[in-house]
C-alpha cells in the first residue's frame, strides 16, 4: 500500500513554514492554487472530499507564515481526530517544525515527517 499521507503533510507544513511573512496578492493566489491542486491530486477520493470540506468550512488564512502554519496545524489535527490519532498542541507543533528546520539547515535534511508519522 502506498503511504502518501506523511509526504502530503510534509509538503503542506513546509510550504506554510516557508511562506512569506508579508505576502503580496500573487503569493496568496499561488498558495491558494497550490492547495487546491494539491488536494485535487490526493489519491484517496474520501480524503479529497474531506479536505475540500475542511477548506470550505475553514478558509485559508494567508496574512503571513504563522497564520498559514496555524491553518495547516488545525487541518492536520482535524484529520488526526477523525482517524483517532494523537492531537498535538500548537507549542508541540512549533517545537516539531523548529527542530526540523534546524536539522535541515545543519544537516541538509529533515525528520519533520518522522515527528508526525505516528500522529
Curated annotation (Swiss-Prot):
Q: Does the UniProt entry include the keyword Flavoprotein?
A: yes
Please state what class of enzyme this protein is.
oxidoreductase
Per the record, what are the reactions this protein catalyses? Answer: 2 R'C(R)SH + O2 = R'C(R)S-S(R)CR' + H2O2
Xref: Gene3D superfamilies: ERV/ALR sulfhydryl oxidase domain (1.20.120.310)
Q: InterPro entries, from UniProt?
A: ALR/ERV, ERV/ALR_sulphydryl_oxid_sf, ERV/ALR_sulphydryl_oxidase
SUPFAM superfamilies in alphabetical order: FAD-dependent thiol oxidase (SSF69000)
Full protein name: FAD-linked sulfhydryl oxidase
Amino acid at each position: 500500500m502506498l503511504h502518501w499521507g506523511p509526504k502530503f503533510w510534509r509538503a503542506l507544513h513546509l510550504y506554510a513554514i516557508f511562506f512569506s511573512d508579508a505576502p503580496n496578492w500573487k503569493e496568496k493566489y499561488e498558495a491558494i492554487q497550490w492547495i487546491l491542486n494539491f488536494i485535487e491530486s490526493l489519491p484517496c477520493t474520501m480524503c479529497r472530499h474531506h479536505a475540500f470540506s475542511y477548506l470550505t468550512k475553514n478558509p485559508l488564512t494567508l496574512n503571513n507564515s504563522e497564520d498559514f502554519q496555524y491553518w495547516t496545524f488545525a487541518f492536520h489535527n482535524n484529520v488526526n481526530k477523525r482517524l483517532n490519532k494523537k492531537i498535538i498542541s500548537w507549542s508541540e507543533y512549533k517545537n516539531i517544525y523548529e527542530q526540523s528546520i534546524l536539522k535541515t539547515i545543519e544537516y541538509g535534511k529533515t525528520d519533520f515527517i518522522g515527528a508526525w508519522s505516528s500522529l
